[in-house]
Amino acid sequence: LGRSGELERITGIEKIFRLPIVNDWDKKGLGRKFFTFPDLSLGKEEQENIVAALQNLCKKSVFLVPDSQSADAIKQFYEDNLKDTKVFDAKDIEESKQPFVDSSAATVILANRFDGIDFSNDESRLLFIWNLPKTTNLQEKFLITRMGASKLYAERIRTRIIQAVGRCSRNPSDYSIVCVIGDTIQNDLTKQEKIKQFAPELRAEIQFGLENSMDYSNVNDVLELKIF
């Protein structure tokens, strides 16, 4: 956060001295991410089938959703269709995420959370991003959608996306599947003018995911990512 004046707006300080970035630090990410965008080739009617199939494949997952209403809907879906999978929310792991870690099959549903809780290594290899919004409050939403101030928040939105997709890959040897479902955040991950703003490694991972996702013809094609 710096090139667009984000720090100055947040703190109200006019002049901020910035420490230089370590060589190549801004060009590398933590771990590897296999992106999949099933909505690009499969209909929305397949979304629930994709979630169930990937959950059964990986057993443990993290679910990022926009609000508590969406969280309740996802929780109900798991209770109805994936009865052997334990469902946790932010309150359940507030003091410790160990109950989730110790479960053989589980998901943790986090509403409107871009950062703050990490799941490294085998804690979770699967991350669902479900209609996650680019804004976190009404003021940001108003300025972006009604006042045409999207450029002012472009850097902040990009940072949030980077934080969101990295919840399950927290060290250089870590890896995770990132399944993006819904239109809100997907637009920032599929448009070429937006993709080129990301670091080279993340940009390549997104591009690879886009190319693969265009050829899905059924849910089984999505499951081919188990090779990853």
What feature does the model see in each segment?
Residues 2-54:
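Interdomain hinge/linker at the junction between the two RecA-like core domains of SF2 helicases
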Residues 26-36, 79, 140-148:
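Gly-rich Lys/Arg/Thr-decorated short loops/hinges at beta-loop-alpha junctions or inter-strand turns
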Residues 15-22, 62, 79-95:
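Conserved RecA-like helicase motor-core motifs
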Residues 65-69, 85-98, 111-115:
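Conserved helicase motor
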Residues 3, 46, 70, 153, ...:
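Helical mechanochemical/support elements of P-loop NTPase systems and associated helical scaffolds
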Residues 1, 54-78:
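Conserved strand-helix element at the start of the C-terminal RecA-like helicase core
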Residues 171-228:
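Long, largely alpha-helical accessory region at the distal end of helicase-like NTP-driven motors
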Residues 99-188:
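Conserved RecA-like P-loop NTPase helicase motor core
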